Every structure is written in C-alpha cells, then in structure tokens.
A protein has these predicted regions:
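Single conserved hydrophobic/aromatic residue that forms the stacking wall/gate
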Residues: 1-6, 165-170
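Membrane-interface interhelical loops and short amphipathic "cap" helices
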Residues: 7-8, 12, 38, 63-86, ...
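Hydrophobic cores of alpha-helical transmembrane segments in multi-pass inner/ER membrane proteins
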Residues: 15-28, 87-100, 152-167
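Cytoplasmic membrane-interface regions of multi-pass membrane proteins
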Residues: 31-39, 95, 99-107, 137-139, ...
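A conserved hydrophobic secondary-structure block that centers on an alpha-helix together
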Residues: 7-8, 12-58, 65
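Membrane-interfacial loop-to-helix junctions in multi-pass inner-membrane proteins
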Residues: 34-55, 103-119, 147-151
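Residues within membrane-spanning alpha-helices of integral membrane proteins
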Residues: 19-22, 50-58, 87, 91-94, ...
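Conserved active-site neighborhood of enzyme catalytic/cofactor-binding cores
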Residues: 62-66, 75-76, 82-123, 127
Length: 171
C-alpha cells in the first residue's frame, strides 16, 4: 500500500475493470455482425455491460485525479499525460456509446454507430495500453525503461493475427 493517500486507493483496478468490460461488448458487437441480431435486442443486451464499464472507468479516472492532486510532485488533478489521456479517450467513446444505446433502445437508428463505437472502445483501450506500456510514449508514469518491451508486445500481436488468419475457418 506504499504511496496510497487514503482507503479509496486500496482498490486500484477500476480502470482495468473498465477496459476489460469493453472486451465483452466488443465481442458482442462482432457476434452481432456475424449473426445479424435485431438491433434493439443487441442494444438491450450490451447496455448493462457498457454501463458497468463506464462506471468503473469514471470512478477510476476521478479517484486517480484526486490521488494525483494530493500526491506531491504531480501538480494537480489532471496533467494531460499520455497515460491519463489513454484512459480518457476510451471513456469519451464509451460515453458516446452509452448515449447511442439509449437512442437505439427507443427507436430504430444508430445501430451501425453502436457497433462501431463498441469496437472502437475496445480498440482504443488496447492501443492506449500498448502505446503507454511499450515505451513508445514517455510519461511521468514511466518508471522503468526497456526498449525491447514494445518489440515483444508488437511481435506477440503480429503472431496472434497471423495465427488467426491462417487457422481453418469453422464450417
């Protein structure tokens, strides 16, 4: 618990829960594209997942900002650091997704937008995490430097894409 200001910082995985939650509705969006599910059924099925993800992401950003304000040397609530921005951008997309789902529930419309935002939220979460943890973007959150780390992550991603591309499709 080194460096914690108060009891609210004992649970430090809020942003992670928000990011992982986005993988659920990302998968649902891909499944909806394949199965041609009814648009309103799709909106209802992912609404609670998006809301839970958005809640944890919001709490994570707020508690992190309050912690940064009280921690010496951080200088304020928000520093516009790459790590902070990589959590804020998926939050903006999640907020737009939540609003689009509410519109889609009430009337037919924005189905394509909901699909795109579902995919974009997860993609931004993964890309942001890759950029700040690979060492490509330097930040005040960077505590260790290892130039091979980014190459390892990128190689792993390329390998996974190649395996998925070359695997036989189910019939």
């Amino acid at each position: 618990l080194l460096g914690l200001v108060g009891s609210e910082m004992c649970i430090r995985d809020r942003l992670y829960i928000g990011f992982v939650g986005s993988s659920i509705y990302f998968s649902a969006a891909l499944a909806a594209l394949i199965s041609k599910i009814d648009s309103q059924s799709f909106a209802i099925s992912i609404k609670s997942w998006v809301l839970v993800s958005w809640f944890f992401q919001t709490v994570g950003i707020l508690v992190g900002s309050i912690w940064a304000y009280y921690e010496l040397g951080w200088g304020g609530y928000w520093f516009w650091d790459p790590v902070e921005n990589s959590s804020l951008m998926p939050w903006f997309v999640m907020t737009a997704l939540l609003h689009s789902i509410l519109v889609l529930e009430r009337r037919i419309g924005l189905y394509s937008w909901v699909i795109v935002l579902s995919i974009l939220t997860f993609t931004m979460s993964v890309t942001g995490t890759f950029l700040v943890r690979s060492g490509i973007l330097n930040s005040v959150h960077t505590f260790a430097s290892d130039p091979s780390r980014g190459l390892f992550i990128l190689s792993f991603l390329v390998l996974m894409v190649c395996l998925l591309y070359t695997s036989p499709s189910p019939r």
